Amino acid sequence: HVAYHTEHLKILLAHRPGFTAPTQAARKVATLDNLIDGRLWLHIITGGVDADQRRDGDFLSHDERYARTDEYLQVMKGVWSQEEPFNYEGDYYRCSKASSEVQSIQRPHVPLWFGGVSEAAIPVGAKHADTYALFGEPRSQVTELMALLQHQAAANDRKLSFNLSFRPILGDTEGAAWDKARSILAGVEASSPKSRGINASGKGPEAETARRLTRLIEGGEIQDECLWVPIAA
């Protein structure tokens, strides 16, 4: 619908490996890229919380999921780039004479976005991603993380682009914006006073990104000039 009513806007589509064969997913993505005139970006979401994955029947561990994503993207890229049918055999996927008659408009393939900053995630993202998606953290931490990711990418003869996600809170004046922020916090605390930062097992966050944000909250309400973090995690 969005693509039909726009001409230049890029479409960022979230896609979770593990529930569709990578060969089939590669053909679907290439087809969609053709239908919307080469405006598709694909954000690979591996999944950082066991309970969320298990609701959909995925019982692999956190690190196993990232290992599977690595294979998934190897196969997808093979479908997009190989001129001849190819075979693949890994721990999670096997295919024989995989190919696609449809190729994406964007070459060599639809740009890949990736998220995750755990020890299992970073090597996979640095190997495959075109754009690495990060959450808003203090400048020093973002700079350190970007340097680590670029170092990992360089080991694969690659260079990453980055997306940094913030949720701006706006007001007619700075004071009004701060009043609005604290009103939002009061609403969050009223609706979930005991559950914030706690997962289904009753423990702290499983995902490394969530753990980083939780530690950030413990460091103070405002960081840098106006990075406000009480509801970051």
Regions found by a protein language model. Name each.
Residues 18, 40-54:
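Substrate-binding cleft and catalytic face of glycoside hydrolase catalytic domains
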Residues 25-28, 114-124:
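Short, acidic/polar
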Residues 17-34:
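Glycine-rich anion/phosphate-binding loops
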Residues 11-15, 40-44, 112-115, 130-134, ...:
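Hydrophobic faces of well-ordered beta-strands that scaffold small-molecule active sites
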Residues 2, 32, 42, 76, ...:
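Conserved, mostly hydrophobic/aromatic
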Residues 118, 124-133, 137-141:
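Long hydrophobic segments that form regular secondary structure
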Residues 5-8, 36, 126-132:
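Glycine-enriched alpha-helix->loop->beta-strand junction motifs that scaffold or abut catalytic
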Residues 48, 56, 62-106, 137-233:
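An alpha-helical appendage that flanks or caps ligand/catalytic pockets
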